[in-house]
Amino acid sequence: MATPLQPFLTKTHKQNPIIGFNILTFVVTLFVALFLVVFLVAPYQFEIKHSNLCKTAQDSQLCLSYVSEIVTTESDGVTVLKKFLVKYVHQMNNAIPVVRKIKNQINDIRQQGALTDCLELLDQSVDLVSDSIAAIDKRSRSEHANAQSWLSGVLTNHVTCLDELTSFSLSTKNGTVLDELITRAKVALAMLASVTTPNDEVLRQGLGKMPYWVSSRDRKLMESSGKDIIANRVVAQDGTGDYQTLAEAVAAAPDKNKTRYVIYVKMGIYKENVVVTKKKMNLMIVGDGMNATIITGSLNVVDGSTFPSNTLAAVGQGFILQDICIQNTAGPEKDQAVALRVGADMSVINRCRIDAYQDTLYAHSQRQFYRDSYVTGTVDFIFGNAAVVFQKCQIVARKPNKRQKNMVTAQGRTDPNQATGTSIQFCDIIASPDLEPVMNEYKTYLGRPWKKHSRTVVMQSYLDGHIDPSGWFEWRGDFALKTLYYGEFMNNGPGAGTSKRVKWPGYHVITDPNEAMPFTVAELIQGGSWLNSTSVAYVEGLVE
């Protein structure tokens, strides 16, 4: 049988054995050289070609190993990222039945609840990654920002799930799966950060009255009171509306609505827990005023867990809440008890009151904007890992339990490539009437780092005298003090002095406006592209 080398070894005339041996040696040497080129040089060239994709990864070698699973030699960065995300979707879909099986094997109701939360978060994450693939394909700056926001939310979802399971000692059952998903989410963010985007769009669009993702009709709605709005459905306890509970009205709202759907809730106290699921898009809930329409609940961590303890939760994109009070009345003795949890992208909370004690407002994930609202609490009462801006709000520390300290914020950013952070701008950070006379007995701080890359900036705001001179407090020892970013810029009031502030590597007294700009509506939440349509008042930059 002929061999591949036969043409080099066969002679039609008289064969010289020395020449034949030399030819054989040459061919073997050539074959070995080609082998080395293909199997040694080619991977090196791949690594050189695609190493930029992993340049912002915390573990670049691990990132490259993931990239090598799906890369082809002709793939550009965007194509590689898309293939990686497609595989990521499959992995999450495979994880869902694993978590569901474990849930069905557990009898403890609280543990089942934690696993139910994980299933919900995984389901949301599948959609967010799928949407990111479509956004990346458009190759524009605004869509790149969308993808970064959504993938940041995916990582937050996975970390939230792991936190929930860890609190019930369930992480060992799911830890391997979750650790893998968390790692891949971080790699996806690193790859996205390395993919260049066109410069043909400008995300900062000057001053306006809302981020760009708020339509002109939404603007008009947000300039109106509830009774003046032509609502799709009305909620009234006395039977004069379409429904007597908000939960019924939300459940009846159309799924995946592309236009604004308004539910008007008349004056009254509604004792219920409400969830605006991911399918309830572009939903607006409006009441008769923050002191007139009250939604109240009392779920808490003592009786369950933090994530589902909210009185109202919103996940559906484009959510608007206006002229309503959301409260959790569990009290300080019940520890974490959330009034409002928001994971809805491009959401607006306007002229609302949010009342509780510990963990009042869970700004969980995605882009959020709060305006002219009143938020009260004690420990970590604004927490989560959203990209969130508060403007013209009153942020009010209450009297905590004995031996407790007030923490205004506890930001939960876990990766430097996440486009998340808490920005408090043009706000009043003040003491409640019950705290004010005893504020020397209960210290109040601007925040503490919940996660390793915690990021919070307080700027152009009034800080009352209850703020401790050190300003910020550690979470545990020196955890995150080098990796966090905490900043203060142009604040005023008796608590605004920075001479006695903490000396952490990650703390910054900002003097350059350019350093403050990333925490504005324009840049942190790309507000110029979506708030315009809501009609809520806002400032996009640093100048009112």
Curated annotation (Swiss-Prot):
One of the protein's GO biological processes: fruit ripening
State the CDD domains in the record: PMEI-like_4 (cd15799)
Keyword vocabulary terms for this entry: Aspartyl esterase, Cell wall, Cell wall biogenesis/degradation, Fruit ripening, Glycoprotein, Hydrolase, Secreted, Signal, Zymogen
Q: Which enzyme class?
A: hydrolase
Q: Which residue positions hold the site described Transition state stabilizer?
A: 358
Enzyme active site: 359, 380
Residues listed as glycosylation sites in the UniProt record? 174, 257, 291, 532
Q: Spell out the SMART domains in the cross-references.
A: PMEI
Q: Where in the cell is it found?
A: Secreted, Cell wall
Keyword match Repeat: no
* Gene Ontology CC annotation, any one: extracellular region
Q: List the disulfide bonds.
A: none
Record: residues binding substrate: 306, 336, 448, 450
Q: Which Pfam families would you find in this protein's record?
A: Pectinesterase, PMEI
Q: Which reaction does it catalyse?
A: [(1->4)-alpha-D-galacturonosyl methyl ester](n) + n H2O = [(1->4)-alpha-D-galacturonosyl](n) + n methanol + n H(+)
Q: Which InterPro entries match?
A: Invertase/methylesterase_inhib (IPR035513), Pectin_lyas_fold (IPR012334), Pectin_lyase_fold/virulence (IPR011050), Pectinesterase_Asp_AS (IPR033131), Pectinesterase_cat (IPR000070), Pectinesterase_inhib_dom (IPR006501), Pectinesterase_Tyr_AS (IPR018040)
UniProt pathway:
Glycan metabolism; pectin degradation; 2-dehydro-3-deoxy-D-gluconate from pectin: step 1/5
- Main subcellular localisation: secreted
Q: Name one GO molecular function term.
A: pectinesterase activity
The EC number(s) attached to this protein equal 3.1.1.11
Function recorded in the entry: Acts in the modification of cell walls via demethylesterification of cell wall pectin.
Return the similarity comment.
Answer: In the N-terminal section; belongs to the PMEI family. In the C-terminal section; belongs to the pectinesterase family.
Additional information: The PMEI region may act as an autoinhibitory domain and prevent untimely PME activity during transport.
Task: Please report the name of this protein according to its UniProt entry.
Answer: Pectinesterase 3
Q: Which organism is it from?
A: Solanum lycopersicum (Tomato)
